[in-house]
Design a protein with these regions (language model features):
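Core SAM-dependent methyltransferase catalytic element
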Residues: 186-189, 194-209
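Conserved alpha-helix/loop element of class I SAM-dependent methyltransferases that forms part
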Residues: 21-37
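A short SAM/SAH-binding and catalytic strip from SAM-dependent methyltransferases
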Residues: 105-120
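Class I SAM-dependent methyltransferase Rossmann-like catalytic core
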Residues: 1-23
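A short acidic, Gly/Pro-enriched loop at the edge of an enzyme's catalytic core
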Residues: 96-107
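C-terminal alpha-helical "lid/dimerization" subdomain adjacent to the S-adenosyl-L-methionine
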Residues: 141-186, 193-194
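A short glycine-rich, Lys/Arg-flanked "PGG" loop and its adjoining helix->strand segment in the class I
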Residues: 122-134
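Class I SAM-dependent methyltransferase SAM/SAH-binding core
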Residues: 42-97
Length: 209
């Protein structure tokens, strides 16, 4: 199965911190203050679920969360998290496949789109866009590379990552595709943009018009 992190589920967070220290964690945590109380939230590709506990620190109750993860082992780890009084529905499915039956106030996609080729980015973005309330928030974070920056180390690191994860997790993408054009075309407004790890990680809080 493409983009499935089952083989390294137990070690994924450790690997992330070994390479990126806490940059991936900070990119996500520093967006969470934007989540309104009582929100319905879609988290797609949430990994081991540590984000659920961070959300619960801010909102210990009142949230309804749909947690979608393609890796069964990641999902099992997520179910063990302390979500306090929040209601979480765990769904074992790919982001492009699960049936969306709810309109959400907040969508969270952290390091999800870097797994996809261009056609799947368009597919997943379109589905999630339709599922987000007008005025809703999309908390986006992912790797970022601008060739004009002259930071060749980022290019080499990207190639190494894709080679590794293609072997381990059958990641379908071979190159990082910038997704900002999707949000721009759909008239999203960026409320906050932040960079981490020397600009290699970018997080944006978008608001749907």
């Amino acid at each position: 199965m493409h983009n499935n992190y089952d083989p390294i589920a137990r070690y994924y967070d450790v690997l992330s911190r070994l390479v990126f220290f806490r940059a991936q964690v900070r990119a996500q945590i520093e967006q969470l203050a934007f989540i309104p109380a009582g929100s319905t939230i879609l988290i797609a590709g949430g990994g081991t679920g540590w984000i659920l506990e961070e959300i619960a620190r801010i909102h210990p109750s009142g949230l309804r969360i749909t947690y979608v993860e393609i890796s069964a082992k990641m999902l099992d780890l997520s179910k063990k998290r302390d979500v306090k009084g929040n209601q979480v529905s765990y769904i074992h499915a790919a982001a492009e496949d699960f049936g969306i039956s709810t309109v959400y106030d907040v969508i969270i996609t952290a390091f999800l789109f870097d797994n996809f080729r261009a056609e799947k980015i368009s597919l997943v973005f379109g589905r999630f866009h339709q599922a987000l309330e007008s005025g809703g928030l999309w908390l986006f974070s992912d790797f970022y590379y601008n060739p004009a920056s002259g930071k060749r180390w980022q290019w080499y690191l990207l190639k190494t990552m894709y080679l590794f994860f293609k072997q381990i997790s059958e990641v379908e993408a071979s190159d990082l595709i910038n997704t900002e054009h999707c949000f721009t075309a759909a008239l999203y407004r960026p409320l906050k943009t932040a960079y981490y790890y020397g600009g290699f990680i970018k997080s944006i809080v978008y608001q749907k018009s």
